[in-house]
Amino acid sequence: MPKHGKRYRALLEKVDPNKVYTIDEAARLVKELATAKFDETVEVHAKLGIDPRRSDQNVRGTVSLPHGLGKQVRVLAIAKGEKIKEAEEAGADYVGGEEIIQKILDGWMDFDAVVATPDVMGAVGSKLGRILGPRGLLPNPKAGTVGFNIGEIIREIKAGRIEFRNDKTGAIHAPVGKASFPPEKLADNIRAFIRALEAHKPEGAKGTFLRSVYVTTTMGPSVRINPHS
């Protein structure tokens, strides 16, 4: 088990390990716990009451956070024809077709999100699947990153839409803002994410769906919250 430094241990003393905090309390507390020399990301970590081995119980979706993520998301749009212009006008950072696919094959990866129109997904999947898939960047209709409404998709991502999906342990981890956010905005984003999670509860999931929910910062300790507070 790794040993934490003095800074982390001092922060840990501010957290009551036996307390389940309200969302508002946690939003204020994590700001105190963010003492790194950069603007730490605030994340929600949720353990779900699902069997991740069953495909019908996997949780995947998107949510538009009311106050965004506090960072510029570099969006790559892969399209052709008139959809290229639509993507450019919507604010995509990079737009292209076959030539940009080749650029990625050559090692270029300076983007945070990839969207595509359905008519290019054959080439995207066959040529880029092995590169983008393991990084969670391959466009997917279930993730809301494939569609002919590519302009709308780009605008939503730029405004703070995030994708979430459970890992093989049945947990979900998602960014919900920056430590520099006012606590009220952090609380709004946390609640929006939790509502989206609950809206994606699989029909086959039994018992408590949100088994435990924690809020943490990049370098700070985690704070357990009551997701319905």
From Swiss-Prot:
Family matches, as Pfam families: Ribosomal_L1
Keywords in alphabetical order: Repressor, Ribonucleoprotein, Ribosomal protein, RNA-binding, rRNA-binding, Translation regulation, tRNA-binding
GO biological processes: regulation of translation; translation
Source organism, top-level taxon: Bacteria
PROSITE patterns: RIBOSOMAL_L1
Stated role: Directly binds to 23S rRNA. Forms what is known as the L1 stalk, which protrudes beyond the 70S ribosome surface. The stalk is preferentially stabilized in 70S versus 50S crystals. Interacts with the E site tRNA, blocking the exit path. This blockage implies that this section of the ribosome must be able to move to release the deacetylated tRNA.
Subunit field text: Part of the 50S ribosomal subunit.
PANTHER family registered for this protein in UniProt: 54S RIBOSOMAL PROTEIN L1, MITOCHONDRIAL, LARGE RIBOSOMAL SUBUNIT PROTEIN UL1M
Protein name per Swiss-Prot or TrEMBL: Large ribosomal subunit protein uL1
Recorded name of the encoding gene: rplA
